[in-house]
């Protein structure tokens, strides 16, 4: 629904493939979203990451590359000698300040947003998805250890 109401928004699906997984996390999300009506053109896949730090680092590179491609396509259209389209002097999505919503499990939002800021995402918004209530305490304890590790490693 959000993607339909916001057609200029791109959804970056980030996550690699584990040894026991038939497809990458990004590919699984892609299939789910397309099946549920999201336009494939709004989806960018990052399929190489194996950690939260890599999710955000590789996603940033993918976003920057995509924004540059959009700018280049616009410049190409504007430089076509016989183009019937008027010159585009308005802001397109690639020119607007980047706003990033990080959708992740509720226990993971804080660390993901802090890592995103460390990687240069300025306008970061956490969007939480509910976790399994039975596993929630276990996941929070594990996440605390990951926060300490990422602080020590300089990832956040």
Residue ranges, per PLM feature:
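A structural signal for short, hydrophobic/glycine-enriched beta-strand patches
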Residues: 1-142
